[in-house]
Design a protein with these regions (language model features):
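Short clusters of hydrophobic/aromatic residues that line enzyme substrate/ligand-binding pockets
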Residues: 56, 60, 127, 176, ...
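Short cysteine-rich clusters marking metal-coordination/redox-active sites
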Residues: 127-129, 139-144
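Structured secondary-structure scaffolds
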Residues: 2-47, 99-103, 142, 147-219
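Short beta-strand element of the conserved SAM-dependent methyltransferase core
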Residues: 125-127, 157
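N-terminal Rossmann-like or analogous alpha/beta NTP/dinucleotide-binding catalytic cores
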Residues: 2-119
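Short secondary-structure capping/junction motifs at helix and strand boundaries
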Residues: 86-94, 112-125, 137-138, 149-150, ...
Length: 219
């Protein structure tokens, strides 16, 4: 019986045109997928683009076009490049596609119904370049740009609830994260308190995203 093998690249941001880093990553994934098929396994290779967020919205504004038009043009650049490089991906996902948005909303409803999403007002340091809140330690590392203090209400996923389960799963499944030094790196990270994850942005600040199915004021 053939083994199944699934490989995905990151879904690339479309705030700018594709570059050699995108090509390098996708070629590596393509080689791995082709190898799996060559040895008789059923391989599925996914790549795509992340079309939502503040950076994309601002990039479209700078170009004087609406966000969807900007995304359409950038997505075409990516697919054209993969064709030129003879990349053999089985699918190409865009986060603006209805099939993607439908699944996102379904998962959000499942997690929310399970009681793992809550609303809270948060005040902290926000990195515009990374589009997320960061810690004081991260702000002092010099790795983050465009940092500002921000206070707003958002929705959070109770990631801290699953910290022990994550550690147990990684320890009980030695091949879950490879290579070994990356597994140890993640386990080292999980020894620290795991903060809950902010999963929303208010539409008053950012409206280019997938609307939360349980609160239309947020994406």
């Amino acid at each position: 019986m053939n083994k199944t093998f699934y490989i995905t690249t990151p879904i690339y941001y479309v705030n700018d045109i594709p570059h050699i880093g995108h090509a390098y990553t996708t070629i590596l994934a393509d080689v791995l997928s082709r190898y799996q098929k060559q040895i008789g396994n059923d391989s599925f290779f996914l790549t795509g683009v992340d079309e939502h967020g503040q950076k994309v919205q601002e990039a479209a504004k700078k170009r004087g076009v609406n966000p969807l038009q900007h995304c359409d043009e950038m997505a075409k650049r990516f697919t054209s490049l993969w064709q030129e490089l003879h990349i053999s991906n089985d699918d190409f996902i865009r986060t603006t596609e209805q099939r993607h948005q439908k699944v996102v909303k379904k998962i959000l409803n499942i997690v929310n119904d399970a009681g793992d999403i809550y609303a809270d007002e948060y005040e902290g340091l926000y990195s515009i370049s990374e589009e997320r809140f960061i810690t004081e330690k991260e702000s002092e590392s010099g790795q983050f740009r465009d940092i500002k203090k921000l206070k707003e209400k958002n929705y959070f996923f109770k990631m801290s609830k699953y910290q022990d389960q994550l550690i147990d799963h990684i320890n009980n499944n030695p091949k879950f994260i490879q290579p070994e030094h990356r597994k140890n790196e993640i386990l080292g990270f999980l020894k620290q308190p795991l903060n809950d994850l902010c999963i929303s942005r208010p539409k008053s600040r950012l409206d280019w995203g997938i609307e939360l199915p349980f609160d239309s004021n947020y994406v």
